UniProtKB/Swiss-Prot annotation:
GO terms (BP aspect): L-proline biosynthetic process
Listed pathway(s): Amino-acid biosynthesis; L-proline biosynthesis; L-glutamate 5-semialdehyde from L-glutamate: step 1/2
Gene that this sequence comes from: proB
Keywords carried by this UniProt record: Amino-acid biosynthesis, ATP-binding, Cytoplasm, Kinase, Nucleotide-binding, Proline biosynthesis, Transferase
Binding site for ATP: 8, 168-169, 210-216
Source organism: Cyanothece sp. (strain PCC 7425 / ATCC 29141)
Chemical reaction(s) catalysed: L-glutamate + ATP = L-glutamyl 5-phosphate + ADP
Protein name: Glutamate 5-kinase
Length: 367
């Protein structure tokens, strides 16, 4: 049976930790593994970190850039070298590849999101393995994925993948960082993210990367909502992917949600960047969270931020606790005028007719 696999390999697995130089032996095994799976009929996406790390090695920099401009310049150097090496390795196995560089903006606008989906489908039909990275050279802080764990989860959601493999510098998730606490207990299966409330996930994984275990857990949650099974496993042993697909209990597997969120709501929940907040009274919170209702103007007690109609906003209770996200039918200036008012009063207040709901339930997803 044909399956869609998204494989993310981190900088710590791709490079030597002290120098930032590429680990060609790891890349060779990764390429051979993915090419073999592709020949077996699987659809493969590789999300590869390493552009900044490789760029540092190429330019002789001893540490990761601290400023955005320098990081973007170094990424431009490293991305070209990284893709050249991938192309050389995949070409020896007659496996075509494609470079796909994404920014958050490509997923924020619905039409661009759908265009990206269609592009991936055509690449699959052509037998190509897309190699994805964030377009660091043009990304801005407001529209950055932040790490490739998040990017890989959003790509897995976008392409409706069956599996997301997060290849990292540990063999699985532990109750604490095993490098700091030798008695940390391995975790083989996670049925619900809530099970990990007591896990000490630490922060940054390595000096060359940007993600730690916390970002991988978040990625697993995003993917799980899309019905994608996520596995955290050892990055320097890419053959583990085949073994896991064959049924071996390696790494940590995150079970997907039994009832995945539909594609549009996944887009609202994770791809969009909220531009404002709406604070709601208790009745509105209950109507949305417990009864599945749309948000009406009467339930809004405060409007925060400047946004336009159809922008994404956070929906919060009076204390500021996020309860959901949604697409608004009014801009922030209009909402400041109609907040707390009944729907039938809106035409009189604004001087024109508008939507009865501020956020329709079809455009609302609970957090």
């Amino acid at each position: 049976m044909t399956q869609t696999l998204v494989v993310k390999i981190g900088t710590s697995s791709l490079t030597h930790p002290k120098t930032g130089d590429l680990s060609l032996s790891t890349i060779a095994v990764l390429v051979e593994t993915l090419s073999k799976l592709r020949r077996q009929g699987q659809r493969i996406v590789l999300v590869s970190s390493g552009a900044v790390g490789v760029g540092c090695g190429r330019l002789g920099l001893s540490e990761r850039p601290r400023t955005m401009a320098l990081k973007q310049a170094v990424a431009a150097v490293g991305q070209g070298r990284l893709m050249r090496i991938y192309d050389d390795f995949f070409t020896t196995l007659n496996q075509p590849i494609a470079q796909v560089l994404l920014t958050r903006g490509d997923l924020v606008q619905r039409q661009r999101y759908l265009n990206a989906y269609n592009t991936f489908q055509e690449l699959f039909n052509l037998g190509v393995i897309p190699i994805v990275n964030e377009n660091d050279t043009v990304a801005v802080d407001e529209l950055k994925f932040g790490d490739n764990d998040t990017l890989s989860a959003l790509v897995a959601s976008l392409v409706e993948a069956d599996w997301l493999f997060l290849l990292t510098d540990v063999d699985r998730l532990y109750s604490a960082d095993p490098r700091q606490q030798p008695d940390a207990q391995p975790i083989s299966v996670v049925n619900s993210i809530e099970e990990l409330a007591q896990v000490q996930v630490g922060d940054r994984g390595s000096i060359w990367g940007t993600g730690g275990m916390a970002t991988k857990i978040t990625a697993a949650e995003i993917a799980g909502e899309a019905g994608v099974r996520t596995v955290i496993t050892e990055g320097r042993s890419p053959v583990n992917i085949e073994r896991i697909l064959a049924g071996e209990a390696l790494g940590t597997q995150f079970e997907p949600q039994p009832r995945p969120i539909n594609a549009r709501k996944r887009w609202i929940a994770h791809a969009l960047v909220p531009t404002g907040k709406l604070y709601l009274d208790r009745g509105a919170v209950q109507a949305i969270a417990q009864l599945g209702k749309s948000l009406l103007a009467a339930g809004i007690v405060q409007v925060e931020g400047v946004f336009q109609s159809q922008d994404a906003v956070l929906l919060c209770d009076r204390a500021g606790q996020e309860i959901g996200r949604g697409l608004v039918n009014y801009n922030s200036q209009e909402l400041e005028k109609i907040q707390g008012r009944r729907s039938e009063e809106i035409p009189t207040i604004l001087g024109y007719s508008g939507a009865e709901t501020v956020v329709h339930r079809d455009n609302l997803v609970l957090s």
